[in-house]
């Protein structure tokens, strides 16, 4: 057993709540805050002072530690040299066919869910859902654009269901647990070696959820409009992920874990993020339509930027 103060989900909900309260306490003009380039590595000393003043340096230091622990998890999972079930392997045609079939099936399933549940959505969510439907061919082509012959990185056994709720916090450090894989996947699919960016994407979607969940859980508490809070949410997400990537990438590269060249990493991250957001959308449409805005915004970021 690991002594702990709870999971990272609850810890980050508390942190993000304080960050949003600071918007009011310091009367911060969200529209004038500098925007980060999404999914670009960002050193802490390159974060604008106004962002540090708003969010707090300690928050970004926590994210650096979490990134390091995530990288160390992948380094260990990718270090096996004898057991072929765990040795790193390159991308190939079989994996490409498996992945594309899985993605297209899942995407078509989500399209059907959107069309059947449009009446449950309103305003911003409805607008983004209609935008998604109008761009379904573009999204489908993104999934089919997976060309394994251009990928030089390696696949490893990954966590498979990596999010803030799977991480315990103790003494400002993080402990990762529950390596069973994606609950909806078959055992055979869970054993398929994946790009490490699949776990990174899972954690990034969890950051996105934690930020928006904080807004939804405390709407009556903050003075800013929902639109302003959503804008702040995207800024916060951009800085969280940028700081995470800088530490994660430098750590795995120092250990010679092959996650591919820069353009390849970006492609794999966005591919896995799109996969994850579409997976989430089906759940939200069926269970919490008011929260469908979270995966819809994630999808919109990827297809419109």
Q: What is each model feature region?
A:
Residues 143-150, 259-267:
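Active-site-adjacent structural elements in folded domains
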């Amino acid at each position: 057993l690991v002594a702990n103060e709870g999971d990272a989900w609850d810890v980050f909900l508390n942190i993000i709540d304080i960050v949003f309260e600071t918007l009011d306490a310091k009367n911060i003009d969200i529209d004038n805050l500098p925007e980060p380039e999404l999914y670009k590595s960002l050193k802490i000393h390159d974060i604008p002072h106004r962002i540090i003043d708003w969010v707090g340096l300690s928050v970004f230091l926590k994210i650096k530690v979490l990134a390091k622990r995530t990288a160390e998890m992948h380094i260990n999972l990718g270090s096996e040299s004898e057991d072929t079930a765990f040795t790193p392997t390159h991308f190939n045609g079989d994996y490409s066919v498996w992945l594309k079939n899985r993605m297209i099936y899942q995407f078509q399933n989500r399209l059907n869910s959107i069309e059947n549940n449009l009446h449950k959505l309103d305003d911003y969510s409805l607008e983004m859902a209609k935008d998604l439907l109008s761009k379904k061919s573009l999204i489908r082509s993104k999934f089919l654009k997976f060309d394994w012959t251009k990928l030089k990185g390696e696949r490893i056994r990954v966590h498979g269901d990596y999010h803030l709720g799977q991480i315990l916090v103790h003494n400002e450090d993080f402990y990762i647990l529950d390596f069973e894989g994606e609950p909806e996947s078959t055992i055979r699919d869970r054993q398929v070696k994946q790009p490490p960016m699949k776990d990174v994407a899972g954690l990034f979607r969890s950051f996105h959820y934690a930020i928006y969940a904080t807004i939804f859980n405390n709407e009556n508490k903050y003075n800013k409009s929902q639109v302003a809070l959503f804008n702040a949410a995207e800024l916060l997400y951009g800085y969280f992920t940028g700081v995470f990537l800088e530490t994660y990438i430098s750590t795995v590269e120092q250990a010679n874990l092959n996650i591919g060249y820069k353009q390849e990493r970006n492609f794999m991250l966005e591919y896995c993020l799109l996969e994850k957001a579409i997976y989430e959308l089906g759940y939200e449409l069926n269970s919490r339509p008011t929260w469908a805005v979270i995966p819809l915004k994630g999808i919109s970021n990827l297809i419109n930027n």
